[in-house]
């Protein structure tokens, strides 16, 4: 089923696919086959209490927080560090799980979420990077997974995102 969702305050819309909640959850058995599945598996194990909501006025604040957490982890894993670009990914991704009547997150909200939920973003980003390393091992590019190095790389990418956002704010 297709619905229309508002992309921003203007009159532009984006098409989105809606599905029952069980389809939006991890519906794979065993190892994740995509980076999206790897990130979603990491997001699913994070407790609601560990997340600060994106918006206190949201209808389902933890659903929003989980969607933004998955978005940021996937973007940082794919080396998209700028919050404005991440917001654009959310606006143009038909699979981004967002309630159609609520405004999509903007760059400011994504930056605030990253700061307030740094540990959760770090954990999900580590899972995404671990998945990417496993893919490289399967392709024969790498020979082993280095857990401490993945943790350092996740921290470095979060710092890169903060730096990219600060550079953008300096330019305004």
Which residues does each PLM region occupy?
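Basic, short loop/linker segments at the boundary and entry of helix-turn-helix/winged-helix-like folds
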Residues: 28-73, 78
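Major-groove recognition helix of helix-turn-helix-like DNA-binding domains
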Residues: 100-116
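Short acidic (Asp/Glu) and glycine-rich catalytic loops that position anionic groups and cofactors
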Residues: 16-20, 48-52, 105
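Polybasic low-complexity intrinsically disordered regions
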Residues: 115-172
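Charged, often Cys/His-bearing segments associated with DNA-binding zinc-finger transcription factors
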Residues: 1-42
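DNA-recognition alpha helix
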Residues: 85-98
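Catalytic micro-motifs at enzyme active sites that drive phosphoryl/nucleotidyl and oxygen chemistry
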Residues: 96-102, 128
């Amino acid at each position: 089923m297709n619905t229309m969702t508002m992309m921003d305050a203007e009159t532009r819309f984006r098409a989105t696919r809606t599905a029952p909640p069980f389809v939006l959850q991890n519906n794979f058995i065993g190892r994740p086959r995509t980076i999206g599945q790897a990130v979603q598996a990491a997001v699913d194990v994070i407790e609601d209490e560990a997340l600060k909501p994106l918006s206190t006025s949201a209808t389902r604040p933890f659903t929003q927080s989980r969607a933004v957490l998955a978005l940021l982890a996937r973007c940082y894993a794919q080396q998209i560090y700028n919050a404005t670009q991440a917001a654009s990914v959310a606006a143009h991704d038909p699979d981004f799980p967002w309630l159609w009547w609520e405004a999509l997150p903007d760059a400011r909200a994504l930056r605030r979420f990253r700061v307030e939920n740094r540990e959760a973003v770090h954990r999900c980003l580590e899972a995404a990077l671990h998945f990417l390393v496993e893919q490289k091992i399967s392709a024969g590019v790498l020979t082993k997974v280095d857990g401490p190095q993945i943790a350092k790389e996740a921290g470095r990418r979060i710092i890169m995102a903060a730096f990219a956002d600060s550079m953008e704010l300096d330019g305004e």
